[in-house]
C-alpha cells in the first residue's frame, strides 16, 4: 500500500461508503479496482459495499476467491509481463493459474490484470486465447 492501512481505514474507506451510497440507492453494482496489491484491504473494500473486484497480478486472487468467490464478481488477473515476454509454456501456466482459481467461482471473469503493452507479440495473444478457450470448457 502507498499509505499506512490506518490512513485508508480512517479517510479513504469511510468516504467510499458515502460515495457509493447514491449508486446503491439506484440499484447499481460497483466493481472496485486499484493499482497494486490490495489484498490486505479486501475486507475493508467489501465492507464499503462493492460487488466485485478487478485485480492486477500483485493482488492475491486465490485469497480473494477463497473469501469472496461465491458472493462477488472478480476479474483478473493474468500477468501481462508474461504475455509480453513469455513463451507458450509460461503463458499456459499463467492462464491455468487464473483458471484453476476462478473456475470454482460463479462470478469469475478471466482477464489480464493490466493493460496489454503495445509491443506484445500477436502470437502470444493468440496463444493466450487458445489456452483460455481450451480451459474454459466445463
Functional labels for PLM-detected ranges:
Residues 1-138:
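Active-site loop segments of alpha/beta catalytic cores
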Amino acid at each position: 500500500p502507498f499509505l499506512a492501512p490506518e490512513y485508508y481505514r480512517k479517510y479513504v474507506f469511510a468516504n467510499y461508503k458515502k460515495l457509493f451510497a447514491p449508486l446503491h440507492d439506484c440499484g447499481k453494482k460497483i466493481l472496485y479496482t486499484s493499482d497494486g496489491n490490495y489484498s490486505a484491504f479486501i475486507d475493508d473494500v467489501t465492507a464499503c459495499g462493492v460487488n466485485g473486484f478487478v485485480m492486477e497480478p500483485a493482488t492475491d486472487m486465490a485469497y480473494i476467491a477463497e473469501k469472496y468467490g461465491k458472493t462477488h464478481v472478480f476479474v483478473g488477473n493474468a500477468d501481462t509481463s508474461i504475455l509480453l515476454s513469455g513463451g507458450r509454456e509460461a503463458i499456459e501456466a499463467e492462464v491455468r493459474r487464473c483458471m484453476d482459481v476462478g473456475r470454482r467461482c460463479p462470478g469469475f471473469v478471466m482477464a489480464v490484470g493490466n493493460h496489454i503493452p503495445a509491443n506484445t507479440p500477436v502470437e502470444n495473444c493468440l496463444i493466450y486465447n487458445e489456452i483460455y478457450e481450451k480451459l474454459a470448457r466445463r
